[in-house]
Amino acid sequence: MECFVVPVSLIRYIVYMRFSELLLKMGLPFLSLLVSFVCNSSPTVSDRPNIIYVMADDLGWGDLGCYGQKRILTPHLDQMAFDGVRFTQVYAGSTVCAPSRSVLMTGLHAGHTRIRGNARIPLRPEDVTVAEVLKKEGYQTALIGKWGLGEPGTTGIPRKQGFDYFYGYLNQRHAHNYYPTHLWRNETKVALRNTVPDEDGVGGGVSNNKLDYSHDLIMDEALGYIHEHAEQPFFLYLALTIPHANNEARSQGMEVPELKAYAELDWPEPQKGHGA
């Protein structure tokens, strides 16, 4: 068994292994990207370890210090690699958002999964997701972040696809906006303080009153979920939009609260935001 370890202060023991090994054991083939298995009471891996699967948009292996990159600071991810296993042959299911997520969730090849582009097609009731498989094995299941596989009123919303809990974005374009007017908690809109004068029908656009940064809220929600469910087997799919740019912001690129160490560098503004 290969392990990949990262320190998390809320959990006593953390053990990382290849996601595909567990899913193949359960009878579902799967392409693994990066996954954490979290044991909450014993240093040995239990039959049902807690699972945190982190997915980040537009983050390539060449963006991380642990693969030799020296311009962008990624100390926490580098520590994960140092403490565990650094994968060298892992591939995304597609080059764009929705089909890549569909491959990830269903374990199907991009040529066989229902969703093959960003045309807002939802998953069907008969599609089997990893969340459904794990739920049958006694796991609590949660998606926090970006979904993109089904919008309000469709068969593809997270709680119809095996997830007990959802917080974040349903629509791809909505997820471009880091200061949206709302996020979703299950099937309920959660209003935020931001204003978006040119907001489209799904929540995309550019805010002119940036008060609530979505990914601060998403990470707070994720940490709260881990803390609340630490004593029971859970699967947390943490799907982050960062470092994807806000496409609707055009030349502004990545929207971040502050540029931090990159503010004074002689870089184009989008690259500063990407680094931050």
Where do the PLM segments sit?
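Sensor of tandemly repeated, compositionally biased sequence architecture
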Residues: 7-9, 36, 146
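Bacterial N-terminal signal peptides
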Residues: 25-36
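N-terminal secretory signal peptides that target proteins for export/translocation
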Residues: 1-22
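Solvent-exposed, well-ordered amphipathic alpha-helical segments
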Residues: 2, 35-38
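Formylglycine-dependent sulfatase
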Residues: 19, 39-276
